[in-house]
């Protein structure tokens, strides 16, 4: 639906699916990602909430847990809150220096790099 330009319909359908399948990780993650890929603060705020829920449902330090942490940081970055995004990454990195390893680690570090110039500018 999204590819066909029917994003609103896709959001509505996934919202319904999340209610019908509250324990289906694939459905929950797909909906959270759809919201995170949105274009406005309303979507990003909803995505932040969904990724927090996904984090709570996942095993600590699992790939899903790291993905949820990263996605929360992305949501904060999109919402114009680079300090909060950086804080999530730094706290996670303090406890788990490898940040999930591989691609996830690279994504975390790239997002942190993008947050830092905004922090310096915002503090001037």
Enumerate the predicted regions with their spans.
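"A position-specific structural signal for the A-helix of alpha-solenoid helical repeats
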Residues: 30-34, 64, 71, 78, ...
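Single-residue signature of alpha-solenoid repeat helices
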Residues: 10, 44-47, 85
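Alpha-helical junction/boundary sensor with strong preference for TPR arrays
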Residues: 21, 51, 55-59, 95-103
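Residue-level detector of the short coil/turn that links helix A to helix B
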Residues: 5, 39-42, 80
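Residue at a conserved register position within TPR or TPR-like alpha-solenoid repeats
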Residues: 1, 35-38, 76
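Alpha-solenoid helical repeat scaffolds
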Residues: 15, 49-52, 90
């Amino acid at each position: 639906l999204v590819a066909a330009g029917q994003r609103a319909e896709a959001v509505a359908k996934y919202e319904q699916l999340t209610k019908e399948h509250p324990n289906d990780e694939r459905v929950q993650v797909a909906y959270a990602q759809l919201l995170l890929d949105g274009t406005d603060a309303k979507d990003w705020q909803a995505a932040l909430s969904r990724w927090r829920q996904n984090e709570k449902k996942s095993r600590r330090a699992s790939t899903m847990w790291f993905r949820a942490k990263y996605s929360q940081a992305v949501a904060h970055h999109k919402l114009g809150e680079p300090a909060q995004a950086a804080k999530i990454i730094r706290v996670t990195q303090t406890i788990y220096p490898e940040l999930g390893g591989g691609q996830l680690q690279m994504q975390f570090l790239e997002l942190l790099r993008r947050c830092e110039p905004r922090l310096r500018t915002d503090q001037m």
